[in-house]
From Swiss-Prot:
It comes from Cuscuta gronovii (Common dodder). Belongs to the peptidase S14 family. HAMAP family: ClpP. Its EC number is 3.4.21.92. Pfam families: CLP_protease. It comes from the Eukaryota. The gene is clpP. It catalyses: Hydrolysis of proteins to small peptides in the presence of ATP and magnesium. alpha-casein is the usual test substrate. In the absence of ATP, only oligopeptides shorter than five residues are hydrolyzed (such as succinyl-Leu-Tyr-|-NHMec, and Leu-Tyr-Leu-|-Tyr-Trp, in which cleavage of the -Tyr-|-Leu- and -Tyr-|-Trp bonds also occurs). Its main location: plastid. This is ATP-dependent Clp protease proteolytic subunit. One of its GO terms (cellular component) is plastid stroma.
Amino acid sequence: MPIGVPRVRFLYDEDTGQVWIDIYNRLYRERCLFLTHTINTKIGNQLAGLFIYLGIQDDPKDIFFFLNSPGGGIISGLAIYDSMQVVRPDTQTICVGLAASMACFLLVGGTITKRLAFPHARVMMHQPLSTFFETQTGDAVMEVDELLKMRENLIEVYAQRTGKPHWVISEDIERDVFLSPTEAKTYGLVDVVGVTLI
């Protein structure tokens, strides 16, 4: 029998009083966002929208972005990343399980000094992937060209946010690189290893 999503009480306003809402909506209202699935267009749009919504509120408190994801689509991931960068409040990124591929990119995209990995988390970075074995030759060439542009874009951001030279990032992402939280801190992907939010 599925457990479902628990509902909790929330004081909506003085007129309405308390209402029951699911726990994720309650946490969103406390400025806590979660990425716990593969990144796709739907997830990307939802998270980008939530970042923008929280960013336009008149509240300077940090946004907490919890990551436990195998990664996913580049375009949707970049939409989330760009939304994180344009909002006024700082974004604390927290890896609670696995931040792989595009989720690693989002982890490094948090406000510098406010990127955290829990002690038993894992971080994995690699170059963008694509499958073009079923496309026509012309389409495959265009896709490869676009993929190379995205790869350079990702390398640029990783280099800026980790302090590593471009060539180091380029060589390292040639294969899957799994890092412990301590290794991720040494690399510059996170700033803190622990369980206390900054």
